Amino acid sequence: MDSQIRAGLTAAGVNVDEALERFMGSEAMLSRFLKKFPADQSFAILTAALEAGDHEGAVNAAHTLKGLCSNLSIRPLFAGFDRQVALMRADDWDAAAAMMPQLTEDYNRAVEAILALG
């Protein structure tokens, strides 16, 4: 993996070494799966569900994102969505919604780094 791309992914919160271990050391496989992340609609679904008060839809989308970020080793997003899901399940919807500005910033940073993969 190009050192500049690796540095960008790392700066965006991707634990590249952990992800490569998960993908059996295959940079090509990791790259292929990372490139699918920006196309996933779960973040848009989460945002829309929170705005509409659709609690079930929001929990499902946040839980999906938590899993995706765990599998791809996007650590800040995994931690954020893990916390958000816990808040949602505790019926603390105001706190869960209040996390969206930081989650959006972290999400956009990760997507930007992933798009640099080409």
Model-derived features: where do they sit?
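Two-component system phosphorelay core
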Residues: 1-118
